[in-house]
Amino acid sequence: MMFSSTRQVSFNPLLLSTTLVLTTSLSCALVGSQANASQTNASQTLHTTQTVQPSEAKAAIRHEEGRRIYAEQMEGKLLAKDGQSLPDGVAPKMLLDWLAPGRSPDLLASIGAKPWGNQGLYLGYACVVAEGSDLKYTDGSDLCSENFAERQTHDFYFGVFKLNQGNFQALAAHDGPLNTPVNWNYSNLESTVDGGSDTVPQSVKKLDLAPYKVSDQLTAIGIRVGFSEGFSGGGAFYEALQLYIIDGDKLVNIFSEPMYFYKDLAGERDETGVRARVIDEGKNLLQLLGRKHQGYYDLRLKNVDNGSKVDFRWSRDAGRYLPKNGG
């Protein structure tokens, strides 16, 4: 099913010597047997000349995630890292030795901690490169990222600790570097090229410490991870949310689903030689529902552009959330 609308928008002629034509399309398709799962493409085609200011092109981007990507990729801005500091009493080597035993502090791309809740808890992290020469590829735009041109992978370690009257107390850490894959089968969003298979994240974008209270006893930790793809004349960027809970002395993953995608591709040239830019976006929101299954609240991924949704239910056998009607 295809819905399409076109509108023409004129701008101040003192700033632009052309008109932008915005075309919006929504396409919906059922995914497997999940009747309410749909895949959405929202495309905006901007016909501009070289005199178009970056702010006008950026104005076509609807979501904050896309504007941040545009600022980094097109405007060269280095946005602040998330949590790049340590509380008093926690030395970088102390945190690194706990999170990543045997890894050298000389290979640290970043290290930090962020308060979690109000019980003196912190989520600490360390991003470690393979060789010292790899540090030159760390540009500060992510907590921990893979350099796309060099295909250089960095390892991201993380764990929860407590400061008790200034004394460091290790509570739970992820077993090794972050390697939980993401799959687009039930995401409502456009996928990466290999999105039909499990894809390990290329970068860590943000520590998301919103109160994800998945049960009456457990609050999950959120980590936003990222992926990127390059194409002739453009690129694509994707973000996913991963949730982790404390299980003994380990942090274990219980949810890993796509939340956003942004594509900026070169379009066709018109009869005047103007080349279009095609910007595709899609975004999910995660909702915690009031109903429970096996002691855990149901989760819902809702597409903010077309309202489609997929519900997830706790599986005791799998030890994680699964699509409620995943086929």
Which role fits each region the language model picked out?
Residues 32-119, 148, 235-327:
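Acidic, small-residue rich beta-repeat scaffolds with periodic aromatic anchors
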Residues 117-128, 213-227, 288, 292-300:
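Acidic/hydrophobic-patterned starts of short beta strands in beta-sheet-rich repeat architectures
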Residues 1-12:
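N-terminal secretory signal peptides that target proteins for export/translocation
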Residues 143-213:
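Short N-terminal edge-element motif at the start of the domain
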Residues 135-152, 230-236:
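Short consensus segments that form the blades of beta-propeller domains
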Residues 17-29:
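Bacterial N-terminal signal peptides
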Residues 198-237, 241:
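Eukaryote-skewed repeat-based solenoidal scaffolds used as protein-protein interaction platforms
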